[in-house]
Swiss-Prot record:
Membrane topology qualifier: Multi-pass membrane protein
UniProt GO cellular component terms: endoplasmic reticulum; Golgi apparatus; membrane
Region (Disordered): 262-330, 365-434
Membrane-spanning parts: 25-45, 53-73, 160-180
Biased composition (Basic and acidic residues): 409-419
Lineage: Eukaryota, Amoebozoa, Evosea, Eumycetozoa, Dictyostelia
Catalysed reactions listed for this entry: L-cysteinyl-[protein] + hexadecanoyl-CoA = S-hexadecanoyl-L-cysteinyl-[protein] + CoA
InterPro entries: Palmitoyltrfase_DHHC, PFA4/ZDH16/20/ERF2-like
A GO molecular-function descriptor: protein-cysteine S-palmitoyltransferase activity
Protein name in the entry: Putative ZDHHC-type palmitoyltransferase 1
PROSITE patterns in alphabetical order: DHHC
Amino acid sequence: MSRPSYASATKTYFHNRLVTGPDRAYFIVAMILMLIPEIPFLIFVCPLFEEWITAAIYPVSIYFWIASYIFLIQTAYTDPGIIPRGIYNDDIFAPDHRQPLFKKITVKDTKQEIKWCETCCLYRPPRANHCGICNNCVERFDHHCPWVGNCIGRRNYQTFLYFLYSLGFLCIWIMGFCVAHICIESARYRDNHPSASSAKVFQEGMNKSHYISDYNYSLWVSRFNSNPYRKSAFANFIEAFCPPRYPSFYKYTLDHEKELTTIPTPNNINGNNNNSINNNNNNNNNNNNNNNNNNNNNNNNNNINNGNSGGTTNNGYTPPISPPQMLQRQSSTIRYSLDNLRTSSNSSLGNFNNLKSSRDLNLSTISEDKPKNLSNSNNNNNTNNKNTSEDNNHSSGSDFGGDEENNEDDFKSDNDKEINSSSLSLNHELQVNV
């Protein structure tokens, strides 16, 4: 069973119009690194070429420098294409109802597998992936760039390319003028020192040429594999640099997280149903056992107060269930079973008291009927001889008393057996349930 972390690491600003990742330190370092080479270039290098080229070297350099900052900020604070999370349900995490890990779909006559994300509770679309840093599933996930501080996905891939190309052109611009300045200064130095020779720096590039050729060959072989998303070079260029503005679904994710905090828990929603069940059980116990009326009424009032304290929903909506709420629900079921155990124990105690009272009543009736039986026996045995009548009366009385004592002992033994059996069953139920 999965135990997803429901909190997302994504941060939002200005009513969810700006969406960014959690790592802000790298983003600040990237801003500083972009500032360091530009200022010395404008101060020390550009004035040397102003007399040979034109003054346009300043605005061109500043334009690409500012463009790099704009595209960097836009990429860092744009929703990369976060997919809204699914609704959390107990049936999803049950072992018998767990979702399959993979499903096969058909995309342009090509079968592909989509994977179930246990954190977001959804099947990821094709070319989507889960970012472990932001803790979100992102459409067309490319990578998580720490220097930008955000994921690179479907909605900010265009601005990320603009940032890379503007920054790359700015680096080439600065490095080109710096190399030109070095060449000019070295030429002046050679004029003053004819014996000096130029350095040779091409050995490292030749060593890397073998790796580059092998990598290009592997790309050439892999491009002929089956890919349902493969397009022409022009179509790929248009899709990368001039894509449509895709909608953002992150607001639905925020609304879903808001519902998780405002809607009451399932324990409180199902409180009325549990109370009705308890009331029916208590009413049945009241009809059977008159001695437990006060206890059952107190239990009913406590259950009703506990059910109405949390609030209920009128529209019958079942909210998402997070793992802490699942534990609350399990605890509520345990409480419900304990309440049923208490009611059953009370009913068994009532039966025990009833058996005891019935035994006492039977013993009292036997003791009252004893003199009556003796008088009847004396009246029926009329004889002429008083001695024989008295002996007969004594003998009959002794016999009757012995029989009566035997009956009383048998009745006591039977009642004691029933009481002992009921007490043993009650103790057995309490030990098992506890």
